[in-house]
């Protein structure tokens, strides 16, 4: 073998080993996020699933039938863009909800991670058929805008991906009717933070309703918050960027239904 060939071989081996190290670190991060959503009561028993995009053809995901609070890196599976197994240790299979994750990645190339959980308050709103559309807190308006409810679908079938699909180009968080919540973003941490934000928003809305109903922000206040978001240059989809009424200079609010959230 020539010196040039040796150099190419060593370079290839370096990148291969580096990729393996990076994958292991990502697996550890997935386990950490799984522990967080479990400890915060966002999932029970074996509920929920998490995935991370490595590249256009490789994805890491949590296994089915395993508590997300007690995972270790060897639990994590690798699948292709069709959800087919590339690598999984004995006894582990990819989440049964992998179809939903793959639909998000297919229709949102900017997304690098997806988190699905069953947070108590957000899921309660999903069960009651009430979308999170009331502008009650600046942080929620800026970070989420509003959170629609995707129609009910049978878990592990194409029904949920089909139901979620219509909202993917407009929102970074969706409630799943009678099921839970789905968030996605440009990193695992950001996808998790969106799930936290959805649950916090839902909890505040629930509690304020118990106290006689929330005092909503005015349309002018919401418009100013939308402008702040634009100035921040925050990534992802948001009603501030796609609201049809807002584009026409008309009243833009969290339940005007021009974006399908109402």
Predicted ranges, named:
Residues 8-262:
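Glycine-rich flexible loops
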Residues 3-5:
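Acidic, Ala/Val/Gly-enriched low-complexity intrinsically disordered segments
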